[in-house]
Structures are given as structure tokens and as C-alpha cells.
Amino acid sequence: MMSMNSKQPHFAMHPTLPEHKYPSLHSSSEAIRRACLPTPPLQSNLFASLDETLLARAEALAAVDIAVSQGKSHPFKPDATYHTMNSVPCTSTSTVPLAHHHHHHHHHQALEPGDLLDHISSPSLALMAGAGGAGAAAGGGGAHDGPGGGGGPGGGGGPGGGPGGGGGGGPGGGGGGPGGGLLGGSAHPHPHMHSLGHLSHPAAAAAMNMPSGLPHPGLVAAAAHHGAAAAAAAAAAGQVAAASAAAAVVGAAGLASICDSDTDPRELEAFAERFKQRRIKLGVTQADVGSALANLKIPGVGSLSQSTICRFESLTLSHNNMIALKPILQAWLEEAEGAQREKMNKPELFNGGEKKRKRTSIAAPEKRSLEAYFAVQPRPSSEKIAAIAEKLDLKKNVVRVWFCNQRQKQKRMKFSATY
């Protein structure tokens, strides 16, 4: 390992510490070197009764105790512990293998309790902890068999290579190299934890770079929110459309009912008969009705001829013309009846104006009733004429004149039959 470290370039971010600040390093390194070297023949001769392996272990423990007692006044371990201070910074993973031929170069070994306390209480490492991430980023990751990372504080790990090398150096140092992962090599006190560092890197990468097939939770929430709003907006629009459609259906139904009542032939026939009777009762001729329509001031409606009113009453107009003329004649009839009521309420105002008596026209039903009464009694009394007039809603004078005219008619018919 000494030769391997001497061939590698140094990427230290900070200047290396001079060796003259550590005067007690040589004694501790000498003690550890004695522990690592084979037992001399002289010692085997002096302690022939003891096993050589037990002696070697005892000397190793003594060397470790010396190193611990001397290392309490120094924040860093001796040069011999790390083989060289210029190549690798102090980390919790780079300790001297006591049995060098039994350990692979990339295995991590735990620190002794005294060394761990020294590293934790070191003020230099406390200052370097803040720059751990920057050191790891600047140190970079080594290749598979190269050094683990840069030599700066908080940079890459020790000289261990391979896929698991290149761990983060120092507390807070990031992962270095392709084998470091997010959990650096110094953060793995156990060899199994070192493999977890490699597993954590793709997991974090997958968390950082989400696959395109899985949408972001925020985007999913936003899409759900807009979808609900959209759904809500679509439901409100559907309710408005349904309400408007229902109103349109109701309006169409009402209009259809009105149109049906207006366009029903039986309704038109009943109105035409009613209009004729009320017109006769008012004493107005068909020509007067046609000329009076211009006084209604209805847009697009002027005076009509007498033949048009006659055809309306006799139902000989076309169906569309009957439908168009019905509201006009109804308006005139209401106005004429209103004027008639006013005239009856104030008869003195209209007596001077009536000079010519209008010819009375009797409707067919009333005419048939009068003919039936005439067949029974051609000469009724005055009381009988008054009762007939009241029953048929006609004037008494009209009924009297009709009976008189009917007798004259029958006389002419008899005279023509005789001669």
C-alpha cells in the first residue's frame, strides 16, 4: 500500500500539515512498527515458555495503549498510521491493518475508541464539516481501482478502490465516484452498510428524476382540481341548459296550446257565429265593421270590405286568413260593446244623433225559434211577444215586427198559390 499511495497524484484542497508539529509521531510509529514486525529471535529465546503469537499480541496491545496515550494531545494520528499524511486526509475508514496480509485493500475497519473520540473532538474536523459537501463535489469520484476522491477536507474517501470505493470524506461529505453513492464510505461503519450506499444512489436518482410515466403529485393534484372544476362547471352548464330547455319546452307547450286554440276549426267556427250574433245585436252592418277596423290603429291593418267580413262569418275564407282576422275582429267587438255600454248608461247624449234606424238581422237559431212560435200562434199577444223577446234575448219591437212580417209573407205565399 505504501507503493500504491506513492504512485498516485495528490488532489488536496488544503496544504498538508508539516510534520514538525507532531514531535511524538515517531515514537508511536516505532511502537506500531514493532508490533507489526515478526518477533526477534532474542525475544523468543528470553520467553521460550510463551507462545510467539501471544507475545506478538501483547506487544501489539502495548503499542496501541502507547499510541492512544500519546494521541490524546494531538488531533491527528501518526504518520505511520496513515502511511503518508500528504496523500490521504484523516478519515474514520483508513486505519492501519495490523495483519496486512489478511485484509483486502478496500475493506473498511472501525477505529479504536480513543481514535474515534479524537476525530469527533477535533476542532479542525469541526471546521471542515461545513465544507464537506463542497469538498466532495470538488474531489469528484475516482475510477474503479483508483483513489476514492480528492484529498481536500470533506472530499473523497481513502485509497480504497473498486465499485465500493470513492466514499464521501469527512462529516457532511457527499458521495464521491461511481461507487460512493449518496452515503459516503466514511458513513458505513459496517461492510453491509457500504452496499446500502450503492442502493441509495439509484433510489435517490429515481426520486430526483421521476420517470415520465409517473406524473408529479403536484401536477396530479392540479389536474384533479381543474378536472373537478371542469366537472363542476360542466354540471352547472348542464343544469342551466336543462333549465333553459325546460323553459323552452314549457313556452313551446304554452304557445302550442294557444296556437292550437286559435287554429282549431271548431273554435274558429264558434267565434264566427258569436261575432255575427253580437254584431247584429249591436245593430252594425258588415260594411260598418269593415270601415271601423281602420279606427283601431292596429299596425298593418286598414279598412276591409263588406265581402271579407261576410266571408269570415260564413267560414268561406281560407284557414290562414281566418286565423289572422280573428284577433282583429275580436278587438273591434270588445271596443264596440264597450261603446254600447256607455251609450246605454248615458242615453241622452246619443238620442239626437240617431236619425236612421238600422235594419235588424236575426240569426238562424233565433229565426228557427220564432218560426216555431209562429206555427203555434201566428198572432201572439203583447205579453207573449215580450216573453219570447226576453227568452231569445231580442228586443220586443224586433219580435213584434218579425211576427208582422211573417204574417205578410204567409199571405203572399197563399195568394201566389191560389192564382
UniProtKB/Swiss-Prot annotation:
It is linked to Ataxia, intention tremor, and hypotonia syndrome, childhood-onset: An autosomal dominant neurodevelopmental disorder characterized by global developmental delay, mildly impaired intellectual development with speech delay or learning disabilities, delayed walking due to ataxia, intention tremor, and hypotonia apparent from early childhood. Brain imaging shows cerebellar atrophy in some patients. GO terms for cellular component: chromatin; cytoplasm; neuron projection; nucleoplasm; nucleus; RNA polymerase II transcription regulator complex. It comes from Homo sapiens. Belongs to the POU transcription factor family. Class-4 subfamily. Residues 261-338 form the POU-specific domain. Keywords: Cytoplasm, Developmental protein, Disease variant, DNA-binding, Homeobox, Intellectual disability, Nucleus, Transcription, Transcription regulation. One of its GO terms (biological process) is innervation. The C-terminal domain is able to act as both DNA-binding domain and a transcriptional activator. The N-terminal domain is also required for transactivation activity on some target genes acting as a discrete activation domain. Neurite outgrowth and expression of genes required for synapse formation are primarily dependent on the C-terminal domain, however the N-terminal domain is required for maximal induction. Residues 356-415 bind DNA. Residues 94-117, 131-197 are annotated as: Disordered. It comes from the Eukaryota. The gene is POU4F1. Residues 99-108 have a biased composition (Basic residues). Multifunctional transcription factor with different regions mediating its different effects. Acts by binding (via its C-terminal domain) to sequences related to the consensus octamer motif 5'-ATGCAAAT-3' in the regulatory regions of its target genes. Regulates the expression of specific genes involved in differentiation and survival within a subset of neuronal lineages. It has been shown that activation of some of these genes requires its N-terminal domain, maybe through a neuronal-specific cofactor. Residues 131-184 have a biased composition (Gly residues). GO terms for molecular function: chromatin binding; DNA-binding transcription activator activity, RNA polymerase II-specific; DNA-binding transcription factor activity, RNA polymerase II-specific; DNA-binding transcription repressor activity, RNA polymerase II-specific; GTPase binding; RNA polymerase II cis-regulatory region sequence-specific DNA binding; RNA polymerase II-specific DNA-binding transcription factor binding; sequence-specific DNA binding. Interacts (via N-terminus) with RIT2; the interaction controls POU4F1 transactivation activity on some neuronal target genes. Isoform 1 interacts with POU4F2; this interaction inhibits both POU4F1 DNA-binding and transcriptional activities. Isoform 1 interacts (C-terminus) with ESR1 (via DNA-binding domain); this interaction decreases the estrogen receptor ESR1 transcriptional activity in a DNA- and ligand 17-beta-estradiol-independent manner. The keyword Iron-sulfur does not apply. It is found in: Nucleus; Cytoplasm. This is POU domain, class 4, transcription factor 1. Gene3D superfamilies: Homeodomain-like, lambda repressor-like DNA-binding domains. A motif (POU-IV box) lies at residues 57-66.
